[in-house]
Amino acid sequence: MSSGCSCGSGCKCGDNCSCSMYPDMETNTTVTMIEGVAPLKMYSEGSEKSFGAEGGNGCKCGSNCKCDPCNC
């Protein structure tokens, strides 16, 4: 059911690649980074692997500026 899925401006997937009604509308998010002194974590937990730049569901823009994969 990925026929309605398309990438927005800048070849970025629409609203978390959920085939939004307006794929060209981008959502701006403010992130606050708190830096401090902590031991370096040298292992990876399963929950951290799902976090990504496109909302954490592994969606990215593939060939011809189409969402790949698009989990609609």
UniProtKB/Swiss-Prot annotation:
Keywords: Metal-binding, Metal-thiolate cluster. GO terms for molecular function: metal ion binding. Metallothioneins have a high content of cysteine residues that bind various heavy metals. The keyword DNA-binding does not apply. Coiled coil: none annotated. Belongs to the metallothionein superfamily. Type 15 family. PANTHER family: METALLOTHIONEIN-LIKE PROTEIN 2A (PTHR33543), METALLOTHIONEIN-LIKE PROTEIN 4B (PTHR33543:SF37). It comes from Erythranthe guttata. This is Metallothionein-like protein 1. InterPro entries: Metalthion_15p (IPR000347).
